[in-house]
Amino acid sequence: MGQKVHPNGIRLGIVKPWNATWFANTKDFADNLDGDFKVRQFLTKELSKASLSRIVIERPAKSIRVTIHTARPGVVIGKKGEDVEKLRTAVAKIAGVPAQINIAEVRKPELDAQLVGDSIASQLERRVMFRRAMKRAVQNAMRLGAKGIKVEVSGRLGGAEIARSEWYREGRVPLHTLRADIDYATSSAHTTYGVIGIKVWIFKGEILGGMPAATEAAEPKADKPKKQRKGRK
């Protein structure tokens, strides 16, 4: 059932890292989890225009370290680092421990599923035709080296009375292959007709984990001599 399971969740620990890396005992686990949720909620709201890809949270020795992956680091940092300092103070207040914020730049936003989904959502909210937005996203991803991409939108497409789903795919997206590096994300566009959901799968290639790929061709087997059939006289 590779079509149904979450592509990121099934690959955790195989080819995908966790978005939160910390360990806590039973007493502190719920507080840490709640703190993570509030920090993510706050940063997602504050940085809604900063092309936010993902937020990674670590908790070393009674502190919190947040790494923000974004395609527009200048917007997050602000003039002379003022904005990032405000974020650090706010995160420390929410989490209740000293905070440190790192910024990581996403070099190719066209190959990041979350950024592609958000881009399509913003286009739909600006009344761009959904087919044009989908095709443009697919073409840009393939042009920059993606092995495959699939984009699906669902809802009242084009203001139709009955909601439906449409999708485009180019290349291959092997959901069953666990070593396949598939980036998956969802987004939503709030239009005048209602909410349109967007799903994006991007296949970037297979991660073999240091194992050498089998390049030696198998030896051809000797063909067995075929028995000749006797023809009728």
UniProtKB/Swiss-Prot annotation:
UniProt-listed PROSITE patterns: KH_TYPE_2, RIBOSOMAL_S3
MF-aspect GO terms: mRNA binding; rRNA binding; structural constituent of ribosome
Keyword terms: Ribonucleoprotein, Ribosomal protein, RNA-binding, rRNA-binding
Coiled-coil region(s): none
Family of the protein in this entry: Belongs to the universal ribosomal protein uS3 family.
Classification via NCBIfam families: rpsC_bact
Protein name: Small ribosomal subunit protein uS3
Taxonomic lineage from the root: Bacteria, Pseudomonadati, Pseudomonadota, Gammaproteobacteria, Vibrionales
Name of the gene encoding the protein in the UniProt record: rpsC
